[in-house]
UniProtKB/Swiss-Prot annotation:
The keyword Nucleotide-binding is annotated on this UniProt entry: no
Ranges of biased composition (kind: Acidic residues): 884-894
Protein's name according to its UniProt entry: FERM, ARHGEF and pleckstrin domain-containing protein 1
Entry-linked PANTHER family: FERM DOMAIN CONTAINING PROTEIN, FERM, ARHGEF AND PLECKSTRIN DOMAIN-CONTAINING PROTEIN 1
Biased composition annotated in UniProt, kind: Polar residues: 458-513
Residue ranges, annotated region (Disordered): 374-522, 864-907
Keywords annotated in UniProt: Cell membrane, Cell projection, Cytoplasm, Developmental protein, Guanine-nucleotide releasing factor, Membrane, Repeat, Synapse, Synaptosome
Quaternary data: Interacts with PLXNA4.
Primary subcellular site in the record, as a coarse category: membrane
Location of this chain's protein in the cell: Cell membrane; Synapse; Synapse, Synaptosome; Cytoplasm, Cytosol
Native source species: Gallus gallus (Chicken)
GO CC aspect terms: cytoplasmic side of plasma membrane; cytoskeleton; cytosol; dendrite; dendritic spine; filopodium
Amino acid sequence: MGETEQRPTAGSRLGAQENAGISTLEHGQKPPLTPPGKLISIKIQMLDDTQETFEVPQRAPGKVLHDAVCNHLNLVEGDYFGLEFPDHKKMMVWLDLLKPVMKQIRRPKHVVVKFVVKFFPPDHAQLQEELTRYLFALQVKQDLAQGRLTCNDTSTALLISHIVQSEIGDFDETIDREHLAKNKYIPQQEALEDKIMEFHRKHTGQTPAESDFQLLEIARRLEMYGIRLHPAKDREGTKINLAVANTGILVFQGHTKINAFNWAKVRKLSFKRKRFLIKLRPDVNSSFQDTLEFLMASRDFCKSFWKICVEHHAFFRLFEEPKPKPKPVLFSRGSSFRFSGRTQKQVLDYVKEGGHKKVQFERKHSKIRSIRSLTAQPSEQHAEVPKQSFQSSSFAYGDDSDAAAVQSCQQGKELKASTEDTGQHKSPSLKKSPKEGRKVDGAVVSAVEEEEEAATDRMQQNRPQSQQPSTAGSLTGSPHLSELSINSQGGPSVANMSLSPNLSPDAKQSSPLISPLLNDPSCIRTEEEEEVKKKRFPTEKAYFIAKEVATTERTYLKDLEVITSWFQSAVSKEDCMPETLKNLIFSNFEPLHKFHTGFLKEIEQRLALWEGRSNAHIKGGHQRIGDVMLKNIQGMKQLTIHLWKHNEILTELENGIKNSRKLETFCRDFELQKVCYLPLNTFLLRPLHRLMHYKQIMERLCKHYPPNHVDFRDSRAALAEITEMMAQLHGNMIKMENFQKLHELKKDLIGIDNLVIPGREFIRLGSLSKLSGKGLQQRMFFLFNDILLYTSRGLTASNQFKVHGHLPLYGMTIEDSEEEWGVPHCLTLRGQQQSIIVAASTRAEIDKWIEDIQMAIDLAEKSSDPVPELLASSPPDNKSPDETTVDQESEDDLSASRTSLERQSPHRGNTTVHVCWHRNTSVSMIDFSIAVENQLSGNLLRKFKNSNGWQKLWVVFTNFCMFFYKSHQDNHPLASLPLLGYSLTIPSESENIHKDYVFKLHFKSHVYYFRAESEYTFERWMEVIRSATSSALRTRALSHREPHTY
């Protein structure tokens, strides 16, 4: 008998070895028996556009077919993929892994099932297998061709250039043109061919695996990456598109994202006929709940989208597959659906624990001409990815009419699954089909693997094209406060850049880094590297003081560039600013930027000599910094004329904004750019604040040196020079700080006129509860030297705070009301026309308010100036002076439902006002003054939550917030962590950190560990962070700074 010729399988075409299958059953369990019955042939279209035929029993569940395809491809991380097919109504649906195949695919002979990517992780570095990344790259290629992945021409050309590099290797103009002529990656490709080849020329030496990685790195930053749009209408009948992603449910208008609902804020998903319903969790301090409603084309279409949402939530948010609920004995109401398969957490854990063997494979396009690929071994560079934090939340699914809503697994429940390898024996489950396909006559054990974890919000920031995973967070996309709070806005994010609760406009919780931190493998330091680091650099305190000058100077230069480069460039493109104002701003900032560029260069050269990186033979004479500081501080005195102009610049810019709607819109839009990570007018104060930092550094250096030290004389002279400069400019700086703060608060408030008037000074802002007819209601209070405002956070597109009322301080009295009203930490503020009752969250908080309000009352008594009309539309107040009834106020603005078209707030969500609202705390002007003094920049290592890896980040601490960058060269932060409300401690022995110079940040359930490089830097980080995490006492503030004259 002649032997039957063996056709290559889909896996062998990719070069994969036959896989016996990997068992993921618990110990003692047996694989399910394959249901008997007639075999049916199913045609599967692979991602490389080839077709394979599989034969499965009619009654076999969908999981048997899915596992057969994964085994056929030798695909370990098969859980990211799914089988998609058109149902009897020609609607594309996913194969249900629990239902019999025949009940879903009713006419298998006439249906082609597509094997495609179903779950797109926030960061492709979480994909451990090169084969998996290759299949993801094929999906990107397919989405480009089909018009699903939309982007600008430059991004499109860059994506295609990496595909071409992966397929044919290094650039050759003739071969490139021939290849592009034969292969159409997008419609109308001809217009981009020159740009594609221009990018391809830069990829010389890049292996196919690296090209795949870079392709996914670029693709994941695109807004439409992994997005499948589902047409719908909102309550007003406006046509929109819904989509689901790893972060939550997204709303699009066309191809533009206009809103997003993070999983952490979604309480329940359901559908009722054609209506898709999203029930949001209420805010912490309010009882109302939002329910958003969308109308879809049909009940089947609506149910299909609901099932996809359930699967995405379970895969990305749960720790383990949800357990099936017992079926009701008599009646069942509504639809029920359960996610079947491994969650991403389980996939990550399995791969991390080494529950698979690396598979070498060859690609469909193997004729490549890469310099490196001729000798390179199969890429293992992305084999391990450090863990990020992973969170789950209680979440209900169900038809709105059913009582059996499926609850998610308990938050925080860790899976400890024992996985057993079945060995390398040949699996009997896959046999050759007479129709040149594969048939299944035995149970196929799913080749499900797990990869390590980090469900991070995808970040839309630009990053260097390297292996950069995405909070915080929050970290997020847009900076949403995710608590490191590293998103939302958004945060990243985030990746899990979200390290803590999001303080986004919608309070979308992910975690507190605003946008996701990166889990780049290249960020992890080994112990050997640490030892080299310790041996290489000096250890004396003076060196680290000098290094602090350099690190903070880098940040100061970046802040200057926001004005001299980014703002100036934007202004030049828009005709919105008078020439006189342009000249005033840039003629006084450009000399500063030029001077400090040279200053930084000198400092870095001195540090290089000190460290022995150059001219080591003369190193001994350069272990000092005082002479460099003295020379440059004397040079700064020549620039004092420009510093005096900054008060005028700030005033004229705000006047211009007040008088020109066009300039106001321009500045507001500029503040939304990622590079403008603080309010615009804050950058105008940076030069004066920098002088104060020089003074502090020189004081620290002089205190460290003994009088006979070679550097002491120059250091003391430099301190005298900078002290003289500060004395001249200090009064001007105090006025500018108050003026800037009033204008910043003005942007956060609506319903108020004349907030900024001569003589008015800001004292404190914060969250208090106000007693009204509906009970205690959270309100935001703003205390000035003549008036007290109370507001609520509105649901407007700008996310501002709406003013409800104001109390003049003249004649006001404060009464303790805890016993009268039975509310802890409660007091009555009794004004001449109105009285209100307020309560704080803690005794310390109410004491700070009492102290500051009493001080403000005393100041108001001394002033004879009347309080001007503040509210834009003040209703008549008929209350008598002695009336003590609780003030009634409308809650309509709080309970108004939002529509799907309400864009995520263009207003920055991580301002101090919003952080205080979410953290239920307060800050004073003295706290702001202390924050100005306590600014720091430098490298820190952040510990990954569930591994021993440490990630190196460039961190800038300013304005009560840590901003995280990949390196000091980045133009904008990737994530942020507001620290108000956090506690700062040193890890205990039980936390098993086992490293020096580690500090711990903790807020509720959010914990982060950071590690400094030396004892000095550790103490400095502890000092500056403690200024934000600790309540600022007035006595401490006055010891640091001259009292503010109100």
